[in-house]
Amino acid sequence: MSKRKTKEPKVETVTLGPSVREGEQVFGVVHIFASFNDTFIHVTDLSGRETLVRITGGMKVKADRDESSPYAAMLAAQDVAQRCKELGITAMHVKLRATGGNKTKTPGPGAQSALRALARSGMKIGRIEDVTPIPTDSTRRKGGRRGRRL
């Protein structure tokens, strides 16, 4: 009988982020979509093709009514910042979005607190841009001819 060859386990070094020099910033793009029902915080690479982290306010709280709250957005943003630090991202460009279209163009209550939580957690903020879709000639808004009657 021949002796069985044992394979030595290969040691792989896993680098989550890009290799950078000391003091150099690694940028990601954080897309904050704040509606009045939920707040989405979605981090991609600079091209926007590769999703790195995506967390919503609804993933952080139990009650449905609290999904869009500033508290849920703050918890989600802290989670996102921690995950980004693990991946090696140190700075972010922010793209803030409201519902837009023929609906409301003002961001929901979680937008400001999410942005503040990202900044307070040690992330450097690059550009802040509003990417709410604004129609040039909109479709008709819901509510009918006489509007919503309260």
UniProtKB/Swiss-Prot annotation:
| Locations listed in the record | Cytoplasm
Record NCBIfam families: PRK09607.1
One GO term in the molecular function aspect is: structural constituent of ribosome
Listed A to Z, the keywords are: Cytoplasm, Phosphoprotein, Ribonucleoprotein, Ribosomal protein
User: Which family does the UniProt entry place this protein in?
Assistant: Belongs to the universal ribosomal protein uS11 family.
**Is Kinase included in the keywords of this UniProt record?**
no
Output the GO biological process annotations, alphabetical, semicolon-separated.
translation
Q: Which domain of life is it from?
A: Eukaryota
- Quote the protein name from its UniProt record: Small ribosomal subunit protein uS11y
Positions carrying Phosphoserine: S19
GO CC term, one of those recorded: cytosol
